[in-house]
C-alpha cells in the first residue's frame, strides 16, 4: 500500500518534469526574462547571469537587448571605458546623458583629478571599479583635449596700479563666475578665482578694489598728465608771451604778469602771493568744471588776454590738467583775435600743445562761440590782429587797428558793400558802411549792448591805477561803426 502511494507521487513528479512541451509549463518558465527584478540587479550588470539560473532548468537564449555602444566610434559615457564582456548591455536609464555631457565635467569636480569613479553614484562606485579593473582599459588615462572647460588664474597684483582707480577686467573663460564677494577682503589671488570658477555659463568680471574710495576720474587724469605733460614747465603756445600749463605751484606763477585759473577744484593762489609782488601779478580764478557753460565768460576772458598780450605781458592760462578747459579758452582767443575757424584754431594750438583734448561739451560750446563771432563778424574783423610771429603788435598799433573801421575792412563782405545803393542809405548819416537789413541791425544792437555790459564789468575789475592803461585800451576796442549807429535818431 505504501509502495503504491510512493509510485503515484513519483508519477506526479514525472508528469511535471518530463513534459517540457506542455503549453502550461512554457508559461511558467518566463522564456523572455520579463519578470526579472531589474532593481535588484546592478544597473550596469548583465540582464542574465549564470548565478541567477535555476539548477537543472533548460536555458533559453535571451533576446539581445538594445545596445547603445554598437557604433562606428564607441561613445564614452562620462569618460568611463567600455566594459569588456561577452555580451554588452545598456546602462540604466537614470545614467543616460546627452552627447554634450561627454565633454563637460560635473560642477563639483571641475578642478579635481579625474578618477574612474567620476560622476557615479556612491552605490555604484565599487562595482564600476571592479569592472574597470578587469578591463585592459582600466588605466583610464584620457587625452587632455577632451576636457574643454578651463578655469583661469589671474594674478591681480600684476594688474593693479598704485594710485589708479579700480578697473574692471573681463575673463574670457567658458565657465566662470563673478567673485565680487571676495573683493571685500582685499586683492584677489589665483585660488580665489579658481574657487569661484565652478558655476556654469557665467562670465567673470573681476572688480579690483580701489585704494581710495574718494578717488575720481579728474584726480586720475591729473596724476597721469602731470607726469607726462608739461615736463619742462609752462608751454609757450602763442609767442611771445602766452603760456599753457597744468596745475601750477606758487613759485610757478610768480614769474607771470597775468594768471588765469579756469579750474574750480584748483585753489585760488592770489592770497598766497607775497605782498611785494601782489601789485605786479593780476590773478583771475574762474570756477569752471568740465560741464560748465563757458560761453558766457569767453568774451570777457579773451579780451583780458588780448589786452595783456598786446602790452607784452607774460600770461599763464591753466586748469588742472592743462588739456581741456584752459586749452578751450586759448582756442576761443585764437578764434576771436586771429580770425580763424574752430578747426583752424584748434589745429594751430594742437600743433604746439600735442596733448590738448577738450571734451565734447566744450567743443560744442566753442562751436556756439564761433557762431556768435560769425554773426558779429564786422565788429570782430576790426579786432582781428596779425600773428605775433609775423608782426609784433604794440599798443599804438592795437589802438589804430581797433579804431580803423573803414570800408576796406568790408572788402571781404561783398554782399554788405553792394547794399550801398539801398534806399536806406538816406537815413544813415554815418560815413561808414553799416548793416542795412532789420535783422542785421537788430543783431548788431544786441551784440553791442552785450559787449558794453561786459566792458563795464571789466572796467570795474581793472579800476586800480596800475591797470588804467588796460581799461583805456579795452574801452577803445569797441569804438566801431555799430557803436556810432546806436546814437543815430
Curated annotation (Swiss-Prot):
InterPro entries: Dual-sp_phosphatase_cat-dom (IPR000340), Prot-tyrosine_phosphatase-like (IPR029021), Tyr_Pase_AS (IPR016130), Tyr_Pase_dom (IPR000387), TYR_PHOSPHATASE_DUAL_dom (IPR020422). Gene3D superfamilies: Protein tyrosine phosphatase superfamily. Residues 233-375 form the Tyrosine-protein phosphatase domain. GO terms for molecular function: MAP kinase tyrosine phosphatase activity; MAP kinase tyrosine/serine/threonine phosphatase activity; protein tyrosine/serine/threonine phosphatase activity; protein tyrosine/threonine phosphatase activity. Residues 1-30, 375-401, 419-489 are annotated as: Disordered. The modification Phosphoserine is found at residues 22, 98, 151. GO terms for biological process: fungal-type cell wall organization or biogenesis; negative regulation of cell integrity MAPK cascade; negative regulation of MAPK cascade; pheromone response MAPK cascade; regulation of fungal-type cell wall organization; signal transduction. Residues 1-18, 451-460 have a biased composition (Basic and acidic residues). Keywords: Cell cycle, Hydrolase, Phosphoprotein, Protein phosphatase. Its EC number is 3.1.3.48. Transmembrane segments: none annotated. GO terms for cellular component: cytoplasm; nucleus. It catalyses: O-phospho-L-tyrosyl-[protein] + H2O = L-tyrosyl-[protein] + phosphate. CDD domains: DSP_fungal_SDP1-like. This is Tyrosine-protein phosphatase MSG5. It comes from Saccharomyces cerevisiae (strain ATCC 204508 / S288c) (Baker's yeast).
Amino acid at each position: 500500500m505504501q509502495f503504491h502511494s510512493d509510485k503515484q507521487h513519483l508519477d506526479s513528479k514525472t508528469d511535471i518534469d518530463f513534459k517540457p512541451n506542455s503549453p502550461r509549463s512554457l508559461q511558467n518558465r518566463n522564456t523572455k526574462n520579463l519578470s526579472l527584478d531589474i532593481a535588484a540587479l546592478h544597473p550596469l550588470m548583465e540582464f542574465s547571469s549564470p548565478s541567477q539560473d535555476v539548477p537543472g532548468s533548460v536555458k533559453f537564449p535571451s533576446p539581445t537587448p538594445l545596445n547603445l555602444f554598437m557604433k562606428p566610434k564607441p561613445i564614452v559615457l562620462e569618460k568611463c571605458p567600455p566594459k569588456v564582456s561577452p555580451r554588452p548591455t545598456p546602462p540604466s536609464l537614470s545614467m543616460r546623458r546627452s552627447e554634450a555631457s561627454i565633454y563637460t565635467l560635473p560642477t563639483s569636480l571641475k578642478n579635481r583629478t579625474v578618477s574612474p569613479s567620476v560622476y557615479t553614484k556612491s552605490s555604484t562606485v565599487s562595482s564600476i571599479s571592479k569592472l574597470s579593473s578587469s578591463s585592459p582599459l582600466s588605466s583610464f588615462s584620457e587625452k587632455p583635449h577632451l576636457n574643454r572647460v578651463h578655469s583661469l588664474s589671474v594674478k591681480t597684483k600684476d594688474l593693479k596700479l598704485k594710485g589708479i582707480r579700480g578697473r574692471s577686467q573681463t575673463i574670457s573663460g567658458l565657465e566662470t563666475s563673478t567673485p565680487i564677494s571676495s573683493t571685500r577682503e582685499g586683492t584677489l589671488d589665483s585660488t580665489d578665482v579658481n574657487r569661484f570658477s565652478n558655476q556654469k555659463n557665467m562670465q567673470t568680471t573681476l572688480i579690483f578694489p580701489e585704494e581710495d574710495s574718494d578717488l575720481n576720474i579728474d584726480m586720475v587724469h591729473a596724476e597721469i598728465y602731470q607726469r607726462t605733460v608739461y615736463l619742462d614747465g609752462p608751454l609757450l603756445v602763442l609767442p611771445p608771451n602766452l603760456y599753457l600749463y597744468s596745475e601750477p605751484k606758487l613759485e610757478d606763477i610768480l614769474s607771470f604778469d597775468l594768471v588765469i585759473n579756469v579750474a574750480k577744484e584748483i585753489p585760488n593762489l592770489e592770497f598766497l602771493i607775497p605782498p611785494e609782488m601782489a601789485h605786479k601779478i593780476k590773478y583771475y580764478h574762474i570756477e569752471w568744471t568740465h560741464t560748465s557753460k563757458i560761453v558766457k565768460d569767453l568774451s570777457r576772458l579773451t579780451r583780458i588776454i588780448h589786452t595783456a598780450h598786446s602790452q607784452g605781458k607774460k600770461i599763464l592760462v591753466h586748469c588742472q590738467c592743462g588739456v581741456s578747459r584752459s586749452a578751450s579758452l586759448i582756442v576761443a582767443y585764437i578764434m576771436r583775435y586771429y580770425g580763424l575757424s574752430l578747426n583752424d584754431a584748434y589745429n594751430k594750438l594742437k600743433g604746439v600743445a600735442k596733448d590738448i583734448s577738450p571734451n565734447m561739451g566744450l567743443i560744442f560750446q566753442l562751436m556756439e562761440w564761433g557762431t556768435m563771432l560769425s554773426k558779429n563778424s564786422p565788429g570782430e574783423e576790426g579786432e582781428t590782429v596779425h600773428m605775433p610771429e609775423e608782426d609784433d603788435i604794440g599798443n599804438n598799433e592795437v589802438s589804430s587797428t581797433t579804431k580803423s573801421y573803414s570800408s576796406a575792412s568790408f572788402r571781404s563782405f561783398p554782399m554788405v558793400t553792394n547794399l550801398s545803393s539801398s534806399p536806406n542809405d538816406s537815413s544813415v548819416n554815418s560815413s561808414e558802411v553799416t548793416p542795412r537789413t532789420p535783422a542785421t541791425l537788430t543783431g548788431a544792437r544786441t551784440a553791442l549792448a552785450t559787449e558794453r555790459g561786459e566792458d563795464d564789468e571789466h572796467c570795474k575789475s581793472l579800476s586800480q591805477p596800475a591797470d588804467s592803461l588796460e581799461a583805456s585800451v579795452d574801452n577803445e576796442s569797441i569804438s566801431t561803426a555799430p557803436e556810432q549807429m546806436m546814437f543815430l535818431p
